[in-house]
Amino acid sequence: MKEVAKEIIKIDIEDELKNSYLDYAMSVIIGRALPDVRDGLKPVHRRILFAMKVLNNDWNKTYKKSARIVGDVIGKYHPHGDTAVYDAIVRMAQPFSLRYVLIDGQGNFGSIDGDSAAAMRYTEIRMSKIAYELLNDLDKNTVSFFSNYDGTEKIPEVLPAKIPNLLINGSSGIAVGMATNIPPHNIKEVINGCLAFIDDQNITLKKLMEHIPGPDFPTAGLINGKRGIEKAYKTGKGKIYIRAKSIIEIQKKTKKKSIIIYELPYQVNKARVIKGIANLVKEKKIEGITTLRDESDKEGMRIVIEIKKETKAEIILNQLYSLTQLEISFGINMVALIHGQPKVMTLKEILNAFINHRRKIIMRRSLFELNKIRKKIHILEGLIISLDNIDLIINLIKKSSTLEEAKNKLKTYHWYSKHAQYTQILKKNAHSLTPYDKKLRPIDTQKFFLTPEQIQAILELRLQKLTHLEHKKLISEYKQLFKTSNNLENILKNNNILTKIMKDELIKIRDNFGDKRRTKINVNYSDINTSDLINKENVVITLSYSGYVKYQLLSSYEAQKRGGKGKLAVKTKEEDFIENLLVANTHDIILCFSSKGILYWMKVYQLPEASRHARGRPIVNLLPLSSNERITAILPISEYKDSINIFMATSKGMVKKTSLYEFKKPRTKGIIAINLKADDELIGVSLTNGNNTIMLFTAQGKAVHFSEILVRKTGRTAIGVQGIKIKKSDKVVSLVVPKKHGNILLITEHGYGKRTEIHEFPIKSRATQGTIAMKITKKNGIVIGTMQVVNQDQIIIITNAGTLVRTRVLEIGILGRNTQGVIIIRTSKKEKVVALQKANALHLNSV
């Protein structure tokens, strides 16, 4: 058997996994996922731009096929798939992805709807004008290069980057164990911030944010609040909220409202937003939208959302912000590579790193240019020396038998020149010698040795240079280069001069590429709830027996005298009638108790506002009611308190007391409020403080009055205890929690009513048959409702035909318990009173 290996090294698999994974992680972090703080580019983007530079694919040259660039990148610099490289190119060319595109694309490069770009064989690209500033001076030894994957090419480790690209275009990427998400900014603001930081490196963040107030996204939008921005700039991490920009349009003729969305948050897909809105409408999570269409064109974005007349556009818009990507959170995590290591960086650290990078670039560029100029000066000096001694040089060359002899004679001769001076200056500044300067051998003020480079240039000198004019030109160029050399030396020696050059270059970039901010920052933003958009108004809420609900402004009803005919409050079908009526504020929460003892939550303003003649909307469309379940009691509340109880009564005389605090957490599907027997239902709900008295009234005119203390507090799912004993033919119709002042108002089905003093109802024990509250006859009919009233009150009475009358309590007489009352509302033969509610006189406005 042949040997598989000559030597087997045993290693711990745990250690090998750790080391291998660490190597992989660092490779991803440094070589793929994170940008360099200096030029703001990941390796793939840097290599794409470098490949375009090598191909001379500049902004002012013709376009080249994307496939050509992709081929060069993966063949020379980036040994990865062509899809990854082309995807990077596409993103660099998308104006909705980058604040300042680095590639000028021609063809289909995708859309904000998420459409894919055309294949690379169809699209053409070239470098954008601003990208050229990233690569400018690359050929002046400004950055270091390293070998590519096979050692055949050289790649820059970073670009010179005249622009602060990391901030103006941002970056995002997921590495191993870390990620980065840096938002784009406005170039004018960032450069102004750079200039301020250069002038004062101890500048406060508050002062710096006067120049750089926050991110500026290519898709514009609205940033709500500055707290997240400040935190991100201070710590490197933060969260901001970006909202779409919208307006509400009102048609002149129809007065119909439409919500127009004309800017979306950054990186939000327009098509998905529209689809999401459509799904919300379909699932009835948002009510009131009639039409949804996309009218976007080359002029800009325009999503039109038409809504119903009776629907408040502000509420719909707030729901859209809450339920769709019209408002998103953007987590800022400013992680970048600095000195080859990933680091979470603050705004000042990023600016400082960029400025230090620019200092090094300018110094290396200046040194490169100085060496180049000194080399040229060196050659020019040799030519000037030769022209000053042209006759002697020609004679030496003529007398030489070979080229080598001529070079040797020129090299060893002591030459005189009245124009050459560079070598003498260098003699006085020996500390600044470059490799080219060290080749010079000064003798004295006006005598020189020629170097091999100078001798070669002399031997290659064209005869036309021997003219007097050409001689003067050489001397002029020599002096000009000498001045330039001095300037470059000053840059290297004087930090203030270098700083001025850096600032001048930044100002030039700002002036050439600066534009207006797109994203608006709402500095004084505070979270806006839907309720903030709703006026606080008192409304009449009606719920029909068939489950149609709506509200109307209370001020739309005028008070009438006793015996009035009333005003139509709601149009119902013949078989339907109003079962619940209450007055509440638009900002109240209504607790909706169903016939099955389930409690549902709803804001008053979430109910449909409708006219008097409208039936409203089925409440089953607003609440997740099951089959054979209907809302039987509604209780408006403004806040939850543990000291307050919800007291419930059923038609079979059962009562229950539970803390209001137990109902504070709304659930979409509702919660159990009371366990009911099969033939029982909830008829009344009220708030108590633990020391109230309770009154229950039956349809047959009986009443019981007992202390709340007799009913102990129980949990939500309890069945309760007996409050009043009733006959099988009777049922409880009202629950009253009496206050200190006022009377008890009773209304019958035939429109009779009366007021009775509370003290006429003695406080006794619960679970008794009670006392007579009203004399029941065929003339007045059974009791349909009772309530406590005071002299200033007004009441609203409604019939099963939809007729509503509003009258003052003072017009209703005070009578004893064993009386049938007086006519309050005249009803027709088939018409019956079905609901009673109090309207506070302080809130009434006659019309």
Curated annotation (Swiss-Prot):
Pfam families the UniProt entry points to: DNA_gyraseA_C (PF03989), DNA_topoisoIV (PF00521)
Presence of the UniProt keyword Nucleotide-binding in the record: yes
Assigned EC number: 5.6.2.2
Biological-process GO terms, alphabetical: DNA topological change; DNA-templated DNA replication
Active site: Y122 (o-(5'-phospho-dna)-tyrosine intermediate)
Subcellular location: Cytoplasm
Reaction(s) catalysed by this chain's protein: ATP-dependent breakage, passage and rejoining of double-stranded DNA
Gene Ontology CC: one annotated term: cytoplasm
Gene3D superfamilies (UniProt xref): 3.30.1360.40, DNA gyrase/topoisomerase IV, subunit A, C-terminal (2.120.10.90), Topoisomerase II, domain 5 (3.90.199.10), Topoisomerase, domain 3 (1.10.268.10)
Keywords, sorted A to Z: ATP-binding, Cytoplasm, DNA-binding, Isomerase, Nucleotide-binding, Topoisomerase
Segments forming domain Topo IIA-type catalytic: 34-533
Family under the similarity heading: Belongs to the type II topoisomerase GyrA/ParC subunit family.
Additional detail: Few gyrases are as efficient as E.coli at forming negative supercoils. Not all organisms have 2 type II topoisomerases; in organisms with a single type II topoisomerase this enzyme also has to decatenate newly replicated chromosomes.
Assembly notes: Heterotetramer, composed of two GyrA and two GyrB chains. In the heterotetramer, GyrA contains the active site tyrosine that forms a transient covalent intermediate with DNA, while GyrB binds cofactors and catalyzes ATP hydrolysis.
The protein's name in its UniProt record: DNA gyrase subunit A
Species of origin: Buchnera aphidicola subsp. Baizongia pistaciae (strain Bp)
